[in-house]
Regions:
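Active-site acidic-Proline motif in GNAT/NAT acetyltransferases
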Residues: 103-109, 137
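Acetyl-CoA-dependent GNAT
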Residues: 3-98, 103-105, 116-118, 122, ...
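C-terminal "cap" of GNAT-fold acetyltransferases
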Residues: 16, 129-132, 136-183
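Residue-level marker of alpha-helix boundaries and capping positions
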Residues: 9, 109-110, 133
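Short coil/turn segments at alpha/beta junctions that flank glycine-rich nucleotide-binding fingerprints
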Residues: 109, 126-129
């Protein structure tokens, strides 16, 4: 009998349910980069600041992957298996994507792609049409994901300085009726 496929929902993180993922992410980043090249933010700052913090939560529903984002959650949330955040810099006209991470046991199941679609929709819902991010150069899987989603290389932004271990990416999000598309 085949194993049931994964089912998950994406909804806002309101407590500490993603903290264990951020600890794992911090450990992974520390193994790749020196402290001065790590630009990590706490889950508390993402829950309390001008930000949107989303989690992918496993559900008990058996069947294909299902993603319910942001509103109308009817399914009970299980373990948080992935997360992503956006910090809003409204005066500067962009949101910074932070802390995309998926539990190692759940990778390869389109969870990161689903989280990115949800966070981009959340950015557009806030009236912001540009998403930016900083990432390290030793993460080829993450870079491939971002590029496949339409992110392009840009110079350092915000408070970031040029760092040979960092790269900076941007995606223009343009509202198009009920959805959005890439410019």
């Amino acid at each position: 009998m085949p194993a049931p496929s994964l089912s998950f929902i994406i909804s806002p993180i309101v407590g500490e349910e993603a903290d264990y993922l951020l600890v794992r992410s911090d450990e992974y980043m520390a193994s790749l980069y020196p402290a001065e090249s790590n630009h990590l933010v706490s889950s508390e700052s993402l829950r309390s600041g001008d930000a949107l913090f989303l989690g992918a939560f496993e559900t008990a529903v058996k069947g294909s992957c299902s993603v319910n984002t942001l509103k109308g959650q009817q399914q009970e949330r299980g373990q948080c298996i992935g997360c992503v955040a956006a910090r809003f810099y409204r005066a500067q006209g962009y949101a910074e994507i932070k802390r995309l991470y998926v539990n190692e046991d759940y990778r390869g199941k389109a969870i990161a792609r689903s989280l990115m679609a949800a966070i981009e929709a959340g950015v557009v819902a806030e009236g912001i049409q540009c998403a930016r991010l900083e990432m390290g150069i030793y993460q080829p899987e993450a870079e491939a994901l971002y590029r496949s989603l339409g992110y392009r290389v840009i110079p350092p932004f915000g408070d970031y300085l040029l760092d040979p271990l960092s790269q900076f990416l941007e995606k223009k999000l343009i509202k198009n009726g009920g959805g959005f598309f890439v410019d």
